[in-house]
Amino acid sequence: MTIHQSPEAFGYDAFLRQHQNKEVLRFITCGSVDDGKSTLIGRLLHDTKQIFDDQVTALQRDSRKHGTQGGEVDFALLVDGLQAEREQGITIDVAYRFFSTDRRSFIVADTPGHEQYTRNMATGASTADLAVILVDARHGLTRQSRRHALLVSLLGIRRVALAINKMDLVGWSQDKFEAIVSGFQAFAAPLNFTEVRAIPLSAKNGDNVVLPGTAATWYTDVPLLRYLEEVPVKSEERAAAFRMPVQWVNRPNSDFRGFSGLIASGSVAPGDAVTVAPSGKTSTIARIFTADGDLERASEGQSVTLVLADEVDASRGAVIATSDAPLTLTDSLDVRLFWAAESDLVPGANLWAKVGTQTVNAVVKAVHRRIDPETGQAGPADKLAVNDIGDVTLTLDRQIAVDPYAENRDTGSLILIDRETTDTAALGLVQTIVASSKVAPAPTASVTASAEPARSGGLLAGLKRLFGG
């Protein structure tokens, strides 16, 4: 397995093309505090040759000052960047790292283990394709391990790598490993995971992380990195119809008018019939314009300007969809919330709701139930406290274009924003759409430029506002 290739070896242009054409897997690491999440990512970066000699020297120096591994190198320090994290030996913020092999590129989010930082963990999970849930082999499953498994399930992540870490500290006991796996499978049975791959490893020593370990002769499957290289990136659950929220109208002169944005899902080509929500106007794609020239087809994750064959009135907040799979317009939503604000959420609360580039006023009509993070079972509730997960009904001041989250993670998710502080208060997943019979209004700017919260970056940027990132 070739892990690292120098651009000098075959030319910078070829090197860049190779990496641009690779599949990208987004995954998160989560679990209880001190389960070794940051150490695992640091080991992946080190053993895939992603760090330079001067970084290794700095790591050795920092390990002596801040490390938690005695006199040995502490790979967690490659990821824990905040001073508070290094002083406490824990992860607080969400840290993103990038690395690649000859097979695939990776974006990994190291998420906090402490319960008071669980809301930070939702930031990393909101865009991930896969979750690596770490469990300390000495302690087994914890309340926070179960909570994270429930959360990644609620956020639509269907593939899980169950990394049983610190196996060296239990003598690579097969019985201990199988007991943890059995307990996790029993808890996760109702969570609708399509795959749970259990891997025994030692992030500190590197066994079964990048290369196979030799201590556990009873384990004959692949190490973690090989699994991450081979797992399907786009599962059936992520296949979705074309959706592009309009970020701005591109009109440099009277001869050109296009709608610019990031394609949230699906793909589109010239000639495709599209519908613009909320106006309901239809047209066809005339051109797909980019800074590098026109495209024959554009897909999820690409930033493009769509030129339509007809003059269609639309502005920021509109959503362009293929006509064979239009969005639903509604002013009432049943939403599953991950509540992140310190104050309780109660019926009558008035917030901003942001879906893509749409921002509207939202009132909490009712709080229906709270999800128990230990069991995953729902019970009646009339309020939600910080870090609670529950189901509510929102009433909006006008219709917006949405999908159920089960059909589209991008246009089916939202954030709620405190109107007074502009802090992000919750992550929401659209469960049920209550279609309205009233006529959809013409698209307008959501709020004034000076007042609109989380103006760019969508769901992830809005969540990161919680932490000043």
UniProtKB/Swiss-Prot annotation:
Pathway this chain belongs to: Sulfur metabolism; hydrogen sulfide biosynthesis; sulfite from sulfate: step 1/3
Sequence ranges assigned to domain tr-type G in this UniProt record: 22-237
Transmembrane regions: none
Gene Ontology biological-process annotations: hydrogen sulfide biosynthetic process; sulfate assimilation
Residue numbers spanned by region G5: 202-204
Organism domain of life: Bacteria
GO molecular function: ATP binding; GTP binding; GTPase activity; sulfate adenylyltransferase (ATP) activity
G2: annotated span: 89-93
Segments of this protein annotated with the region G3: 110-113
Binding annotation for GTP: 31-38, 110-114, 165-168
Keyword vocabulary terms for this entry: ATP-binding, GTP-binding, Nucleotide-binding, Nucleotidyltransferase, Transferase
SUPFAM superfamilies in the record: EF-Tu/eEF-1alpha/eIF2-gamma C-terminal domain, P-loop containing nucleoside triphosphate hydrolases, Translation proteins
Pfam families listed in its UniProt record: GTP-eEF1A_C, GTP_EFTU
Signal peptide start-end: none
PROSITE patterns: G_TR_1, G_TR_2
This protein's name: Sulfate adenylyltransferase subunit 1
Origin species: Methylorubrum extorquens (strain CM4 / NCIMB 13688) (Methylobacterium extorquens)
